[in-house]
């Protein structure tokens, strides 16, 4: 039982590692929270620091979700891995290492899915990038993909999977509430695939 509690804390702490902040300060000498949207996530990193930093942060944020979800498997615990994944996402959104001001749950949630259901992860990746290249809205693509994740979990019939996806989708949409208003007002920034970045 003690091991379980400790690993839940480890999962939260893994999620709390603010890679966008670390990459910004160490690699570029800036606090990314003071630039762009101020968000500690991949999208703001791409827009503020460029492609290289954006890819590094996004991959790192995905992997921390994957690693956290793997903890009960690695330590042979009889507890559903998605609970540990949720702890990591909570850490990503409210990181203790960055004054509880984190990202929007997208990449780390993807990492959770990568560990728990690679097939669903692959399907959602196709959905996300199809929407992104069609609409050029990262926020809209993220929210719609989150809803599709819920639908996929319902189709699976796995009750814990359904609960976890509902919680993650709810968190993703909640963290994008400001984006929803900007999309409606047509002031939401679009991804610019032709723009040269660092």
UniProtKB/Swiss-Prot annotation:
Keyword Transmembrane helix set for record: yes
Name of the protein in question: Glycerol-3-phosphate acyltransferase 2
Role, per record: Catalyzes the transfer of an acyl group from acyl-phosphate (acyl-PO(4)) to glycerol-3-phosphate (G3P) to form lysophosphatidic acid (LPA). This enzyme utilizes acyl-phosphate as fatty acyl donor, but not acyl-CoA or acyl-ACP.
Subunit annotation: Probably interacts with PlsX.
SMART domains the UniProt entry points to: G3P_acyltransf
Gene Ontology terms for molecular function: acyl-phosphate glycerol-3-phosphate acyltransferase activity
GO CC entries: plasma membrane
The organism of origin for this protein: Bacillus cereus (strain ATCC 10987 / NRS 248)
Pfam families: G3P_acyltransf
Enzyme category, top tier: transferase
Alphabetized InterPro entries for the sequence: G3P_acylTferase_PlsY
Family: Belongs to the PlsY family.
Presence of keyword Metal-binding: no
A GO BP entry: phospholipid biosynthetic process
Keywords: Cell membrane, Lipid biosynthesis, Lipid metabolism, Membrane, Phospholipid biosynthesis, Phospholipid metabolism, Transferase, Transmembrane, Transmembrane helix
Membrane topology, record value: Multi-pass membrane protein
Entry's transmembrane regions: 4-24, 71-91, 113-133, 147-167
Pathway in which the depicted protein is active: Lipid metabolism; phospholipid metabolism
Gene encoding the protein: plsY2
EC number(s) per entry: 2.3.1.275
């Amino acid at each position: 039982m003690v091991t379980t509690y400790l690993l839940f804390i480890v999962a939260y702490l893994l999620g709390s590692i603010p890679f966008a902040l670390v990459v910004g300060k160490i690699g570029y000498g800036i606090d990314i929270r003071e630039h762009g949207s101020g968000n500690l996530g991949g999208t703001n990193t791409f827009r503020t620091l460029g492609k290289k930093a954006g890819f590094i942060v996004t991959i790192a944020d995905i992997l921390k979700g994957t690693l956290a979800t793997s903890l009960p498997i690695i330590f042979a615990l009889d507890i559903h891995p998605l609970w540990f994944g949720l702890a990591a996402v909570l850490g990503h959104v409210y990181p203790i290492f960055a004054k509880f001001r984190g990202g929007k749950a997208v990449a780390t949630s993807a990492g959770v899915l990568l560990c728990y259901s690679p097939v669903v992860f692959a399907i959602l990746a196709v959905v996300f990038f199809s929407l992104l290249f069609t609409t050029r809205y990262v926020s809209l693509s993220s929210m719609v993909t989150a809803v599709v994740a819920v639908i996929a979990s319902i189709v699976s019939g796995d009750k814990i999977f359904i609960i976890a996806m509902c919680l993650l989708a709810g968190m993703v949409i909640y963290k994008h509430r400001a984006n929803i208003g900007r999309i409606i007002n047509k002031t939401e920034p679009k991804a610019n695939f032709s723009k040269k970045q660092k």
